Amino acid sequence: MFNTHKVEIEWGGRPLTLETGKIARQADGAVLATYGETAVLATVVSAKEPKPGQDFFPLTVNYQEKTYAAGKIPGGYFKREGRPSENETLVSRLIDRPIRPLFVDGYKNDTQVVITVLQHDLENNPDILSMVAASAALTISGVPFMGPISGARVGYIDGEYVLNPNIDEMPESKLDLVVAGTSEAVLMVESEAQELPEDVMLGAVMFGHKSFQPVIDAIIKLAEVAAKEPRDFQPEDLSELEAKVLAVVENDLREAYKITEKQARYAAVDAAKAKAKEHFFPEGVEETEMSAEQFATIFKHLQAKIVRWNILDTGNRIDGRDLSTVRPIVSEVGILPRTHGSALFTRGETQAIVVATLGTGEDEQMIDALTGTYKESFMLHYNFPPYSVGETGRMGSPGRREIGHGKLAWRAIHPMLPAAEQFPYTIRAVSEITESNGSSSMATVCGTSLALMDAGVPIVRPVAGIAMGLIKEGERFAVLSDILGDEDHLGDMDFKVAGTEFGITSLQMDIKIDGITEEIMKVALEQAKGGRVHILGEMAKAISSSRAELGEFAPRIEVMNIPTDKIRDVIGSGGKVIREIVEKTGAKINIEDDGTVKIASSNGKEIEAAKKWIHSIVAEPEVGEIYEGTVVKTADFGAFVNFFGPRDGLVHISQLAADRVAKTTDVVKEGQKVWVKLMGFDERGKVRLSMKVVDQETGKEIVAEKKKEEVDAE
């Protein structure tokens, strides 16, 4: 019934298995991949024909984690998986980026890649395995995919590169880098690092590329026995038509791309396109030498050619800069004084307002992952409204691009945040992109760094980011610093680097062509370093280090530690005690399992009141000390006084006053405030108090009678 094929190799000290022919046989390609005991199923389906009028390649990658893979049942009312989590979205993008450039130019059939995590061993992260499985499924599907690709995760532990470190090893690593590519070239890099130098980062990329070669060989081996017949797809030869269109539009496009202002340049390009359309599609003529779709493809191609020719021939870019110049920068902080921290970062025609907000442990984000539930105390959200590029568009929940850009900026900032013990706040940064002409994610990095410093968050060092580009024709190439949006779309590489003056904290690279050598990447990293240091200098004109004090409207958090056996006393039955403390003091209180107590309020008096209350619950009274208390009950033999948090003690009738007392209520009444001295504990551990050795007016001990009365009490 099944015609199965399997390939197994040893990779990074664990078995990697690729199997096809048994599951999802109606898909164009399906591969069950297992690494260690983590298993994923990747499927590929591509439509037989493109939709009429389709002028782009509609590729969708869906990565989905099933909770049963880790032996869990989903939370919530419906008890089933819902909308994609942030991690699922990020992994979908991680897989999409290296495979998208490898589909044959001109292929426009609707294509969907679905990767499902079926089993998670809680050791091997399924993201790299999912990339490998997707590549294998595409390679055997018959779809015009010029792969295969593979990916690898690279760690850096004790000065050594580590291939595919497991989940337990990652906290020790100074690097979390994912690299993907073909056997010849690197196509994609994504990383977070602890201020590592450029040569270490480049070494990690090359180490990863070398390490995944056995996987590519395994995919080829599987394809040799299991691949379907390649689809009969031949890309159109548009060279003759392109030459005709070029003759009409070249001069107009060259002039348009001399205009430095974005909107005016776009208007000139649109005018050139309209003029060419009139030439090739005259009114009233039904039969033309090319279709509208062919014209759109050719015009887009010519736009790229003219920009690229100009850069390589003259060294001048669209906006008149040379290859390494960064656009003018203006940095401002404190622009929204009622917020906890704020910044406006403007670089050329790219601008971001970033606002930092500080919260307590109650504000931490609860994340339910396959590996377990954990809390995240730093959030960075990136918003890209359509007005930022002068357009109308959909508003609402964030899209994949916004989630991806936010995470890239998060990775850049995260290594420079203070430890929770030093700064016990939850931090949320929100970047509102108000203008965009290239590299808005790196503007978010710069703006977030400024806003956090304005908020008084003691980051280790300021962080800046820069986007690099590449134009390559044959042996000639040009590396561009601080690319515009057009240079991103029309170039061969988008290379974002963020870090401090001492090293890189985040790196993201997407390469659209083969042949990017180690030498080119080295040039790009060095050029990026110069740009990054320049940007840090411009940012320092606004603020160079974190403010010494938090903003006026930010909450204050103080931390105290209590014995773990006292946690129950502070919380009380059903939370009664802690609710009372919160209600009466106004402070927010968070108690952790290790006895760490965080008390938060914007009012210092509320914090002190809560601290004093908690201290009174957990502290032990000391023999010989004097306390103020309240009479809670009277009896024939004395009075019970609440004197130390919830603790009560007995003042025997003989200890109420220096003179003989006939009746307890002659001296004290319930609710009366009194001063008492802790004399000790009886054989049953009961508290013994005395009022007569304390001056009830001043609360001071009556020294003259101290020795005699203490003897009497004993």
Curated annotation (Swiss-Prot):
Known catalytic reactions: RNA(n+1) + phosphate = RNA(n) + a ribonucleoside 5'-diphosphate
GO biological process per UniProt: mRNA catabolic process; RNA processing
Compartments (UniProt record): Cytoplasm
Residue span, KH domain: 555-614
InterPro entries: ExoRNase_PH_dom1, ExoRNase_PH_dom2, ExoRNase_PH_dom2_sf, KH_dom, KH_dom_type_1, KH_dom_type_1_sf, NA-bd_OB-fold, PNPase
Sequence ranges assigned to domain S1 motif in this UniProt record: 624-692
Keywords, alphabetical: Cytoplasm, Magnesium, Metal-binding, Nucleotidyltransferase, RNA-binding, Transferase
One GO location term (cellular component): cytosol
EC number in record: 2.7.7.8
Cofactor: Mg(2+)
Any one GO molecular-function label of the UniProt entry: magnesium ion binding
Role, per record: Involved in mRNA degradation. Catalyzes the phosphorolysis of single-stranded polyribonucleotides processively in the 3'- to 5'-direction.
Alphabetized PANTHER family for the sequence: POLYRIBONUCLEOTIDE NUCLEOTIDYLTRANSFERASE, POLYRIBONUCLEOTIDE NUCLEOTIDYLTRANSFERASE 1, MITOCHONDRIAL
Name of this protein: Polyribonucleotide nucleotidyltransferase
Protein source organism: Brucella canis (strain ATCC 23365 / NCTC 10854 / RM-666)
